[in-house]
């Protein structure tokens, strides 16, 4: 990417950028996730993001600036803003401690200590099913199913975060063939629960492949694919010829090397 030729995004890069952009619609307190579904030919069928569903279809979203906040019933606008998933996990942790105390298995003086162990160190912390939000992948599947359902089968799903195990089974059932993600998600048990249908091995084509995205990152999309500020053609209509010049400056030095260079520079200045 030296700016000497016109480069446009691949189908996969375009789809992932679309998913990345869709994530910005989310008001979820935990994380913003975006998804995009394409047909086998790369046609974008639908996008989705994680947020709270509203009655009779769709998700809550900002319709227009200045609209009444009372109409927005997302978590950020309820009771000062709270995550229902965290709230329920706290309630479960307290209920377990109450039970252990009432059964005489722990002393009253150790309630707080036991609560912290249960809440922070047990598998309870990984529970995700108490969230009010529809996940981005499900939102995209629902949207695509309503208009282009037949094209989902054999298609691809692009998502900014690795699918959770709940979404994974719906992705498999929908007939999606490949999934590409940007960020890992340690809580997901997708391959553990569905090893018969899901794989992270790109060579296993008899299963739904879940693979890290390879291409221009969405955060760099506009930088790499926007036209040159001075335009692409001259007054005669001929394309400009330009000297090779990096579109983005990224050092290839390792971090320890960079740190040592900085230390040397500071030392030479007596700092």
What are these regions (language model features)?
Residues 1-271:
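Zinc-dependent deaminase catalytic domain
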């Amino acid at each position: 990417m030296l700016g000497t030729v016109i480069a446009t995004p691949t189908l996969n890069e375009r789809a992932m950028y679309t998913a990345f952009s869709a994530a910005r619609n989310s008001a979820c307190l935990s994380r913003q996730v975006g998804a995009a579904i394409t047909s086998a030919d790369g046609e974008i069928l639908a996008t989705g993001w994680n947020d709270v569903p509203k009655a009779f279809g769709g998700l809550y979203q900002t319709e227009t600036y200045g609209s009444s906040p009372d109409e927005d019933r997302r978590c950020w606008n309820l009771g000062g803003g709270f995550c229902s998933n965290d709230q329920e996990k706290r309630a479960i942790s307290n209920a377990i401690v109450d039970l252990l105390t009432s059964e005489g298995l722990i002393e009253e003086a150790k309630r707080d200590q036991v609560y912290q162990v249960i809440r922070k160190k047990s598998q309870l912390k990984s529970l995700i099913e108490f969230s009010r939000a529809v996940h981005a992948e499900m939102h995209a599947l629902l949207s695509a199913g309503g208009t282009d359902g037949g094209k989902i089968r054999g298609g691809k799903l692009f998502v900014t975060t690795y699918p959770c195990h709940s979404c994974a089974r719906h992705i498999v059932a929908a007939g999606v063939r490949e999934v590409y993600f940007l960020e890992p998600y340690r809580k997901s048990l997708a391959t553990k629960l569905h090893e018969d249908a899901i794989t992270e091995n790109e060579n296993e084509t008899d299963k739904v492949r879940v693979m890290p995205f390879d291409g221009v990152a969405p955060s760099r999309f506009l930088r790499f694919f926007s036209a040159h500020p001075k335009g692409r053609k001259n007054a005669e209509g001929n394309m400009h010829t330009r000297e090779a010049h990096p579109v983005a400056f990224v050092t290839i030095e390792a971090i320890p090397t960079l740190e040592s260079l900085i230390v040397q520079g500071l030392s030479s200045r007596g700092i």
